[in-house]
Amino acid sequence: MKRFMQIWKPAVVGFLLLTLVCGVIYPGVVTIIAGAAFQDKANGSIIEGKLADGETGKYGSTEIGQTFTQPEYLIGRAASDGAATNLNPTSEEQKQLVEKRITWWHKLDPANNRVIPMDLVTASASGVDPDISEAAAAYQVDRISRERGISTKVVKEIIAENTSKRLLGFWGEPTVNVLQVNVALDSLKM
């Protein structure tokens, strides 16, 4: 029994010590630092404001794509709806999904005869991308303007205000945050 305790005591003490350090102390310290240094991001980048019913509430997170399908809103990338988003670009299933989405866009805005930007008919890898390209936002300006009864200039200004530029001026592409644009559009009528 003594030999058993000599072998197992260091293992159990080591296990408990590592559990305390790695499972409690380290995550606690990192959470406190993140909460203090990056308060908005550490709490999910939640947008709060006046909702349509006049109450103050939470719209959603700027980091997770929201589903908007009403014509008066800027509409984001196609949601994955729990399906695989890593389909082969040449697969028949992917082709059918894209054709279905193209048909949906034409029904939503029959007056728009421009080419639909690729990111509006394909899902992102995560399926919850909060941003779209500037081309995808520009494609929707006339419809939003018409549906809300506001000028295209106002819609373009709101989109420009909610566009992230290239990282370091050259890395990546500018993107438009769909939720931030829609919150700004809704704030116009309040």
UniProtKB/Swiss-Prot annotation:
Assembly and interaction partners: The system is composed of three essential subunits: KdpA, KdpB and KdpC.
Protein name: Potassium-transporting ATPase KdpC subunit
Principal location: membrane
Localization annotation: Cell membrane
Membrane topology (UniProt): Single-pass membrane protein
Keyword Ion transport (UniProt): yes
UniProt entry keywords in alphabetical sequence: ATP-binding, Cell membrane, Ion transport, Membrane, Nucleotide-binding, Potassium, Potassium transport, Transmembrane, Transmembrane helix, Transport
Its job: Part of the high-affinity ATP-driven potassium transport (or Kdp) system, which catalyzes the hydrolysis of ATP coupled with the electrogenic transport of potassium into the cytoplasm. This subunit acts as a catalytic chaperone that increases the ATP-binding affinity of the ATP-hydrolyzing subunit KdpB by the formation of a transient KdpB/KdpC/ATP ternary complex.
UniProt-listed PANTHER family: POTASSIUM-TRANSPORTING ATPASE C CHAIN (PTHR30042), POTASSIUM-TRANSPORTING ATPASE KDPC SUBUNIT (PTHR30042:SF2)
Residue spans crossing the bilayer: 13-33
CC annotations in GO: plasma membrane
InterPro entries listed in its UniProt record: KdpC
Underlying gene: kdpC
Record family assignment: Belongs to the KdpC family.
Coiled-coil residue windows: none
Pfam families: KdpC
Single Gene Ontology MF annotation: P-type potassium transmembrane transporter activity
